[in-house]
Amino acid sequence: MTTRSNAVVIILAFAVVACAVYEKKQPVEGDKGIVTAYVNAWNQHDTVALDTLLAPEGIHEDIAQNFRGRGPKQVINFMRGLIVAEPDFKWTITNSYEEGRVVALEWTWASSYSGKDPNGKQVTNRRISGRGTSIAEVEDGKIKRFSDYYDIASFFR
């Protein structure tokens, strides 16, 4: 290797380290912060963050979609399916309440949806939106349970 090649390799190595340090997320504080970070992980399609925030045996329920996943692997698979149907979803917390280890959220959801609507009709890139609530239980800095409640039909009105 030439001196110039060595210099390029060193510069690239510094760039990679700088990016890694820059991208490092700040620690999350408090149960509400953990739950907010979980919602942000969904918005960013960040399976690594989701894996970090959900307890190994943590449960995520989406009551409207009849989904109940245990552990990060099942929840990440659900997330990936949702990303296929709604690649641009935006989950926005409008209010949050914390009492002990329980965090309650009010939220809105908006996306372009492709798939079957609640009536079984195939739709492509249809804009949907709606409101819902979630109840989360945090234990030892991890989400033990996260349950979503909403009327899925209202998203298609």
Question: Each predicted region: which residue ranges?
Answer:
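A mature extracytoplasmic/lumenal domain signature
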Residues: 64, 95, 109-111, 150
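Short beta-strand edge/turn micro-motifs at domain boundaries
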Residues: 104, 129-157
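A solvent-exposed, acidic/Ser-Thr-rich amphipathic alpha-helical stretch
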Residues: 48-100
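Bacterial N-terminal signal peptides
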Residues: 9-17
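A short hydrophobic beta-strand element
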Residues: 101-113
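Short, cysteine-centered beta-strand-loop-beta hairpins and adjacent loop/turn segments enriched
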Residues: 66, 83, 110-127
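Bacterial N-terminal signal peptides that target proteins for export
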Residues: 1-8
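Short, low-complexity N-terminal intrinsically disordered segments enriched in polar/charged residues
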Residues: 18-56
